[in-house]
Structure formats: C-alpha cells, structure tokens
C-alpha cells in the first residue's frame, strides 16, 4: 500500500533537516480549505514550541475530489483570495493586504490545486518544498 503522508515526509528531507536542526517540531492540524474539511489531509505547523511565539511555517497536503476542489476554490475567491493558473495547477493566494508574511514575490498563503490533490504553504515559494505526490 502507498505510504501515508506525514508531516516529516510531505516536505523535502532537506527542509525537515533545516527545521529540526533549528529545534523546531511540528503539530498536525485539521486541514480545512475554503470551508471544506479534508479528512485525509494533513496540515503541519512547524515551530519552536519551547518559546512562546506565533512564528512558524505551515505546510499542507491532501487528496481532493473535483467537487470539493471547486467548492473550496469558489469559497476562497468569495473571501477575496485571487486565482492564477499555472503549468502545474491552479494557484489560489490570499489578499497580500492581509498576509502575515509574504515571499519575495509578494505572495502570502497559497493553495495549489492539481489533479486530485491540493497543497498549501504560508507563502507561494513554500509550495516548492512540498514534494509529496500521493
């Protein structure tokens, strides 16, 4: 059977090493996309839990049906998120005015919807680190 995704396998081994070398660990959260709860999904919040801080990194991955993907996308767009079509799927990005943090291209939290899956990171560049293919 295919391996189940876990917080230390959905992102690249190099990413896990960098984060754990910093003393960071992860907590698994419920992965909810535009009001759609993805029971098979995984949302991972990496942080240094030995200090009181909201500084961390979020990575998510899940399988998703076409119906759920359409519903999640329309819900996010209705909340003011923006859509960009890319070669690898549909990017849905939060309004940068409300972003906690952005990458050097100005993108904050971003979902990438592919064929039967969705990825999430707290910046669009962060999506590159999610290597899980399901």
Residue ranges and their predicted role:
Residues 42-43, 77-82, 104-109:
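Short small/polar-residue motifs
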Residues 3, 30-31, 69, 96-99, ...:
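Intrinsically disordered, low-complexity segments enriched in polar/charged residues with Gly/Pro
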Residues 48-92:
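Long, charged/polar, surface-exposed segments that mediate recognition or autoinhibition
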Residues 43-57, 64, 107-117:
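Long, continuous compositionally biased terminal/linker segments
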Residues 1-48, 134:
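Extracytoplasmic low-complexity, Pro/Thr/Ser/Ala/Gly-rich segments
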Residues 87, 92-134:
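Extracellularly exposed regions in secreted/surface proteins, prominently low-complexity, repeat-rich
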């Amino acid at each position: 059977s295919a391996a189940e995704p876990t917080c230390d396998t959905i992102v690249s081994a190099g990413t896990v090493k960098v984060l754990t070398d910093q003393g960071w660990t992860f907590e698994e959260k419920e992965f909810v996309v535009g009001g759609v709860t993805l029971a098979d999904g995984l949302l991972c919040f990496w942080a240094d839990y030995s200090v009181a801080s909201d500084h961390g990194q979020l990575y998510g991955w899940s399988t998703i049906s076409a119906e759920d993907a359409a519903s999640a996308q329309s819900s996010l767009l209705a909340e003011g998120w923006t859509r960009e079509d890319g070669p690898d799927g549909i990017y849905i990005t939060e309004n940068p005015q409300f972003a906690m943090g952005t990458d050097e291209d100005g993108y904050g939290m971003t979902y990438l919807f592919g064929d039967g899956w969705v990825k999430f990171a707290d910046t669009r560049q962060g999506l590159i680190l999610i290597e899980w293919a399901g």
